[in-house]
Amino acid sequence: MELRKDKLLMFYSEGKESKEAKWAVNDPMSKSYKLSLPSALRPDNLLPGNRLRYTDASKSKSSKVSWYKTILDPGSEIVLKWNWVFIVSCMVALFIDPLYFFVPAIGGDKNYPCARTDTSLSILVTFFRTIADLFYLLHIFIKFRTGFIAPNSSTRVFGRGELVMDPKAIAWRYIKSDFIIDLIATLPLPQIVIWFVISTTKSYRFDHNNNAIALIVLLQYIPRFYLIIPLSSQIVKATGVVTKTAWAGAAYNLLLYMLASHVLGAAWYILSVDRYTSCWKSRCNGEAGQVNCQLYYLDCDSMYDNNQMTWANVTKVFKLCDARNGEFKYGIFGNAITKNVVSSQFFERYFYCLWWGLQQLSSYGQNLSTTMFMGETTFAVLIAIFGLVLFAHLIGNMQTYLQSLTVRLEEWRLKKRDTEEWMRHRQLPEELRNRVRRYEQYKWLATRGVDEEVLLQSLPTDLRRDIQRHLCLDLVRRVPFFSQMDDQLLDAICERLVSSLCTEGTYLVREGDLISEMLFIIRGRLESSTTNGGRTGFFNSIILRPGDFCGEELLSWALLPKSTLNLPSSTRTVRALVEVEAFALRAEDLKFVANQFRRLHSKKLQHTFRFYSHHWRTWAACFIQAAWRRYKRRVMENNLTAIESMENEEGEVGEELVVVEEEECVEESPRTKMNLGVMVLASRFAANTRRGVAAQRVKDVELPRFKKPEEPDFSAEHDD
């Protein structure tokens, strides 16, 4: 025991293991059973006496592995949650990047405008862009630590395949596939261009800053947008859908459409600024005068330069480039200049450009009036193409998601229409049609068009059992007949219960019909009646409420030691008074449950069955009624016997006094006459009563008693 407790091994000098070592290694109950010999022979495991302490390799390995070296399962919960977080961060990053297009702006006054850079906006956008880049960097790290399913593994024939957890194989596969795209999407290229490239080449900033920013952002925007596609595919493979609700899916597609409008509006803005400054440059290069035009004069940083101020007073560049004069054709960019969009505050610029982009995408650019400038016409063509594709994509996906909200309702409407056509074709009477309509309506309200039985049968057995237990256990325990059973038997019952719905006026079973299931009422009321009382004119009716059951003839049949295949007949007619929800135990399932009943050996269960059985209740009521009648008859017989004895005694006394009565007949008092009349009436009543008792005895002999229900066998286990 001491060796087993400490898990110690001893090795002989010639290299043979001792019996103790073999015992410890071969014992499956020992923690050392999973360990290999090399892990036990490490020097740090040595103990005095040439003994080694056997440690749990799994625990020591897990304790030494750091969190950043852990390999993740691509289908695990943490990877799925990260994919959701990353796809949200990607959407935010895609909205942030086009904001760089609003950094170039037009400053100065109306008469002497100049090109400027919105520094405060640059700082703000750079800050949020850097945070978004950190999410991309973290995503690269997670992909280096996420396993994958072997593509050529033979295990993919069945199941999902073999999961590769080797860090080197994971890294090599990632580098060969998506690493380059992820790296390009992660690089902070706009920050580098704005804060390092343009700042160091200040003299050339006016010529190149707009084009450089637009080019860098657009080139990096493509791989960033591409990352959303495989990410959405991974979420769909793992969960089946991108969004959990239809409204979220519709909002997601609408957000993508707004993103396209956002990008289009930002591109239109920077092209408008570029078109405006291009006019300045062309007029500046062609201007000749006392003061030559220099390109840096057009920059707001040189506004306080003496030469620039002298040139601004005599130049005609700004007048010739004014969109109101019509000297220079701006085409689709004219509104940005005439409405001072390029010189407004950021929020004014942004929302106007967003509206312009949304308007052009929705109208496919039909209201655009372009010039002969090739760049402008190309931009208009792209607007028409992307507008058509994106709008069709939006409408299609929105329709799909929104239709999924009412797909069940639409199926029910189609089924209802088909049912109406069928009833009209078969010329069913209005009463039957109303019953069919009520049943379909009630079934829809109860299930919302979901076939619960098919849904549960498609799930694994263990999961189906847990769901049935959650749905049925509390309701089953409300039935007193089931409240006496243990949890194991209740689980078996819950697993076999099926829901049953009945509308008002429905006959669940009629007297004499075969019984195929036993019902346990959850909600509603049923009327159970019978005319089989053993005599003509017998009628008994009771109301079954939640907690009651009907069809116990099937239980008595199932509890028979050798029950036949023929189902029993119903002795009662059961009709729904209102809408009823119940659980049903079918005959084959009840046979299994009945076999479990026998193993309980419970008299209490037998008494509970008697108490809540309407057959036993009816028999008990008839039995008590018959006993009460017998008691009343005995009391009446005793009273009549006493009256007859009194009559006999009075008769003897009357014969002895007959002579006296005759002599005193003339002098008879009114009181004597009254006594004599009472005696005559009493004798007549006694005679009639004797005849009634005799007739009642004959009647009791002729009328059979109400048949006692069969006693279900709960106490013994029988061999098949």
Curated annotation (Swiss-Prot):
It is found in: Cell membrane. One of its GO terms (cellular component) is plasma membrane. The keyword Ion transport applies. Residues 107-121, 200-211, 274-377 are extracellular. Coiled coil: none annotated. A nucleoside 3',5'-cyclic phosphate binds at residues 481-605. The chain crosses the membrane at residues 86-106, 122-142, 179-199, 212-232, 253-273, 378-398. It is a multi-pass membrane protein. InterPro entries: cNMP-bd_dom (IPR000595), cNMP-bd_dom_sf (IPR018490), Ion_trans_dom (IPR005821), K_chnl_volt-dep_EAG/ELK/ERG (IPR003938), RmlC-like_jellyroll (IPR014710). Residues 597-612 are annotated as: Calmodulin-binding. Residues 617-646 form the IQ domain. Keywords: Calmodulin-binding, cAMP, cAMP-binding, Cell membrane, cGMP, cGMP-binding, Ion channel, Ion transport, Ligand-gated ion channel, Membrane, Nucleotide-binding, Transmembrane, Transmembrane helix, Transport. Residues 1-85, 143-178, 233-252, 399-720 are cytoplasmic. One of its GO terms (molecular function) is cAMP binding. The keyword Ion transport applies. Belongs to the cyclic nucleotide-gated cation channel (TC 1.A.1.5) family. Probable cyclic nucleotide-gated ion channel. Forms a functional cation-translocating unit with AHAs that is activated by PSKR1/BAK1 and possibly other BAK1/RLK complexes. Required for PSK-induced protoplast expansion. Homotetramer or heterotetramer. Part of a functional complex containing PSKR1, BAK1, CNGC17, and AHA. Interacts with AHA1, AHA2, and BAK1, but not with PSKR1 or BRI1. The binding of calmodulin to the C-terminus might interfere with cyclic nucleotide binding and thus channel activation. This is Cyclic nucleotide-gated ion channel 17. The gene is CNGC17.
